[in-house]
């Protein structure tokens, strides 16, 4: 009888021990709070750090070209260099320049650091579109009479066409003249701007 009582007591103790919850908790994420809260192994609340990454913002010129109602695509808002090309389908010298302009733009678009926008001097948008299509030009365009063209930083209406104005992202004029001559400088100007920016960052760290 004593052996049976002893065995019953041992079994009861084992059952009671099995029903006790472990001391350490399991990680839980609430998911409802923007910052986020989780539970560590000891059951304490631990706040998740918010990301400190800032979204890249458009430059002064980037914002301005973004307001244009362009055809043949949308201009980049984050280029380092912009070229305003004033040209028209009825202009002989403009037609002579267009094959080279279209070719150079392919390099610019592939690189991603420079953008070109046609400021078309045709009377109609259809005329300007056909002009671009004729030379398989992939850059965006807008008529010179369109809204907000006169507000483009660094832009001035040329007395004669074709004409190209190259500006940095803040609208400072880097070059102004015949398109082929201006476009031949785009990569050099981009590299100069990048070098100046890197030098400025180095000075700020000192």
What are these regions (language model features)?
Residues 2-66, 199-206:
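N-terminal targeting signals for export/organelle localization
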Residues 80-82, 86-90, 160:
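Short pre-active-site segment immediately N-terminal to redox-active cysteine/selenocysteine motifs
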